[in-house]
Amino acid sequence: MLNNAMSVVILAAGKGTRMYSDLPKVLHTLAGKAMVQHVIDAANELGAAHVHLVYGHGGDLLKQALKDDNLNWVLQAEQLGTGHAMQQAAPFFADDEDILMLYGDVPLISVETLQRLRDAKPQGGIGLLTVKLDDPTGYGRITRENGKVTGIVEHKDATDEQRQIQEINTGILIANGADMKRWLAKLTNNNAQGEYYITDIIALAYQEGREIVAVHPQRLSEVEGVNNRLQLSRLERVYQSEQAEKLLLAGVMLRDPARFDLRGTLTHGRDVEIDTNVIIEGNVTLGHRVKIGTGCVIKNSVIGDDCEISPYTVVEDANLAAACTIGPFARLRPGAELLEGAHVGNFVEMKKARLGKGSKVGHLTYLGDAEIGDNVNIGAGTITCNYDGANKFKTIIGDDVFVGSDTQLVAPVTVGKGATIAAGTTVTRNVGENALAISRVPQTQKEGWRRPVKKK
């Protein structure tokens, strides 16, 4: 079906009193992303020409959090109902476009459902998203005559008979821009709440002989709103369960789907294995046969084929070539790069550092602002001293270097190919190729030495 141009209005003016938070409700996160951002992303994926965000409480925080989005900001200074919110956005509606109304606290609405709603909207009429609930208490009821939608009655305004209706309004609808503006201008606040209800446009459309078509979402969770942290946590579990199911069906082995969190996008190869309590954040790529141990956090990183990440390792903004091994308890910070077959062991931290092919950093080491060649062995307790309190400097270590334990490399410094650094050395000058650098104080020995003894 050929669709008209479409713009989206997202209502996000509510304070969210029941969240007990200084943060606007729609900025609370689900799967690591603000609820309203999920809705904005859906609108953009649907091809919205414009996204109008109606805001009120916490406007500065909203603008700061969503500054990278191409949004039209619409202020609703007083929260006088959904109809009033739409009235604030109405001056921006084009007559020949469709207007889709969404909510910033309904984060799991799917693009597929919205596209079906868009396709179902009759010419000159309204497409309405509805669901049937066993217990519809508190929701606006869909009224029908001979099967046709005639209106929506809010729960507080409904008669006892109307309250028996199980089909309820989700609040999501689509209509033509010119029609929407005309109906919005006719709204009144003559109701129990003293508010302007967007739902009243359904009756107005019916009175004009316009067709109203109801569409149901694929899943109830798509239209569930969030008013408190309990509801948010429940939707988080729903979302994570859905993501885990998709990954399992795509061939990823999740040892316990209930203990896996995806807070971004995961691209993966074949035969990937992920143990319990792993968190994936941002954009992550896992190659073929990657294994991730329990308790790991992987963020905005690329992990090559046949890599193994042992338990409780944190990898952020890093790149690993094939067949690397990391951890347990390792930390790769932004700018860390491991070439093929490199090894980073327990309690090793890397930042803005490259580790060459086959090189090994076994344990208890910090490598920052460093470039390390191939087949290098870094002993335990090695530190690149890259910061003088004001500026950072680089350490360069050539191929086939052996660095003994408890070595400090005071940058800027270069260690030539094939050099050896003796254990306990503080390197302050460049070391030539194949040279031995040693700076230990000569050992002295006193025979028959007795330790002092405390007097009783």
From Swiss-Prot:
Binds 1 Mg(2+) ion per subunit. Its cofactor is Mg(2+). UDP-N-acetyl-alpha-D-glucosamine binds at residues 11-14, 25, 76, 81-82, 103-105, 140, 154, 169, 227, 333, 351, 366, 377. The keyword ATP-binding does not apply. Pathway: Nucleotide-sugar biosynthesis; UDP-N-acetyl-alpha-D-glucosamine biosynthesis; N-acetyl-alpha-D-glucosamine 1-phosphate from alpha-D-glucosamine 6-phosphate (route II): step 2/2; Nucleotide-sugar biosynthesis; UDP-N-acetyl-alpha-D-glucosamine biosynthesis; UDP-N-acetyl-alpha-D-glucosamine from N-acetyl-alpha-D-glucosamine 1-phosphate: step 1/1; Bacterial outer membrane biogenesis; LPS lipid A biosynthesis. The active site is at H363. Residues 1-229 are annotated as: Pyrophosphorylase. Residues 230-250 are annotated as: Linker. The keyword Membrane does not apply. One of its GO terms (molecular function) is magnesium ion binding. It comes from the Bacteria. One of its GO terms (cellular component) is cytoplasm. Residues 251-456 are annotated as: N-acetyltransferase. It is found in: Cytoplasm. One of its GO terms (biological process) is cell wall organization. It catalyses: alpha-D-glucosamine 1-phosphate + acetyl-CoA = N-acetyl-alpha-D-glucosamine 1-phosphate + CoA + H(+); N-acetyl-alpha-D-glucosamine 1-phosphate + UTP + H(+) = UDP-N-acetyl-alpha-D-glucosamine + diphosphate. SUPFAM superfamilies: Nucleotide-diphospho-sugar transferases (SSF53448), Trimeric LpxA-like enzymes (SSF51161). InterPro entries: Bifunctional_GlmU, GlmU-like, GlmU_C_LbH, Hexapep, Hexapep_transf_CS, MobA-like_NTP_Trfase, Nucleotide-diphossugar_trans, Trimer_LpxA-like_sf. Homotrimer. NCBIfam families: glmU, PRK09451.1. In the N-terminal section; belongs to the N-acetylglucosamine-1-phosphate uridyltransferase family. This is Bifunctional protein GlmU. It comes from Shigella sonnei (strain Ss046). The lineage of its organism: Bacteria, Pseudomonadati, Pseudomonadota, Gammaproteobacteria, Enterobacterales.
